[in-house]
From Swiss-Prot:
Domain of life the protein comes from: Archaea
Membrane-spanning ranges: none
Subunit-level organization: Interacts with uS11. Not a structural component of 40S pre-ribosomes, but transiently interacts with them by binding to uS11.
LID: annotated span: 94-104
Organism expressing this protein natively: Thermoplasma volcanium (strain ATCC 51530 / DSM 4299 / JCM 9571 / NBRC 15438 / GSS1)
Designated name of the protein: Putative adenylate kinase
InterPro entries in the cross-refs: Adenyl_kinase_AK6, P-loop_NTPase
Amino acid sequence: MGKIACITGPPGAGKSTVCSKLREYGYNCKEGNELAKEYGCLFDEEVDVECLEEKLAEDRFDGIICSHYSHLLGCSTVFILEADLNDLIDRMRARGYSEEKIQENIETQMSSIFYYESLERLPANRIFTLYNGNIDETAKRIISIIERSRNNK
């Protein structure tokens, strides 16, 4: 398996926007659902995470994956994006999420579930929680951590 950095967090935290910015900087950043579709691991709009992890290993994928489940994919580094709760609520409402789903996603961020699930797979020094305020600054911080990690190997 190649080196995979993963960007995760609740819907509306800015994962796709940060991934797009990283692509502008020349990084191989892919949306998890796009990869799942490409590798035949998307069934009825549901991603088979185990299938995707296997295909990524077979393909020796080397890059960055962003999705709310990417931290479950055998990452070497995990970046957890968090955003202001009011911003998250506004973004999810704009996407047509039900109030129940919005509450569920807010509770997910507040409970640090992404961190604890990542901690089951990686040491704490490979997990970074970033408050996503400024997209460019967030992307540059991710790049800095990735490059520092590469230089330490």
